[in-house]
Regions:
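Hydrophobic alpha-helix-in-membranes signature
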Residues: 18-20, 45
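Bacterial N-terminal signal peptides that target proteins for export
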Residues: 1-10
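Conserved polar/disulfide-associated segments of primarily extracytoplasmic proteins
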Residues: 52-149
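Short, flexible, surface-exposed loop segments at domain boundaries
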Residues: 6, 21-23
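Acidic/histidine-enriched, beta-strand-rich ligand/metal-binding domains
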Residues: 29-33, 121, 152
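Bacterial N-terminal signal peptides
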Residues: 9-18
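Short, low-complexity, Pro/Ser/Thr/Gly-rich segments in the mature regions of secreted, periplasmic
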Residues: 147-160
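N-terminal "mature-domain start" segment
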Residues: 25-58, 158
Length: 161
């Protein structure tokens, strides 16, 4: 076997042996549009990944979802912002932990992300009317690359009416 064929075979074997979701082509992930009826927030949720419903989030409206193995979770939540705080002020009042790896704050939303206990946590909140509409995702840090596309789609589809 030539070196080129050996490298191709090794690459294929690596992909086939990798844990989800590398083996799952994006077309094989089933998505649903989850809505928070009380507030109008909506987001795309990968229903073939987050297969279990969990307890409702505290302090707002929405839902929580878990993977079957419970190694990852997703919270979709609308939280009252009756004081009309800006995303920057709202985030500051939540006292985010030190060591945030990624932070972006605009007049309409914020995103923060970091590592904790071998997991990545990602939080995006969009501001509309008297609510902050948020997604919070926790997943194994060792699977970051596999989750990147899923997290991006969830984040980019968060909307409110």
């Amino acid at each position: 076997m030539s070196l080129r064929h050996h490298c191709i075979a090794l690459a294929i074997a690596t992909v086939l042996a990798a844990p989800w979701p590398i083996r799952a082509a994006p077309a094989s992930i089933d998505w649903i549009r989850y809505s928070v009826p009380e507030t109008g927030a909506a987001v795309d949720v990968p229903s073939s990944i987050f297969t279990e419903a969990a307890e409702k989030p505290e302090g707002g409206y929405g839902g929580r979802f878990l993977t079957a193995d419970r190694r990852a979770d997703l919270t979709v939540q609308s939280v009252a912002n009756d004081a009309g705080l800006s995303p920057a002020d709202f985030l500051a009042r939540k006292n985010p932990p030190p060591g945030i790896v990624y932070k972006r704050v605009t007049p309409r939303f914020f995103v923060v992300s970091s590592f904790r206990n071998g997991r990545i946590w990602y939080n995006r909140c969009n501001f509309a009317g008297r609510f902050a509409h948020c997604v919070l995702i926790n997943y194994p840090a060792a699977e970051k690359r596999q989750w990147d596309g899923v997290v991006t789609r969830i984040s980019n589809t968060l909307a409110s009416r």
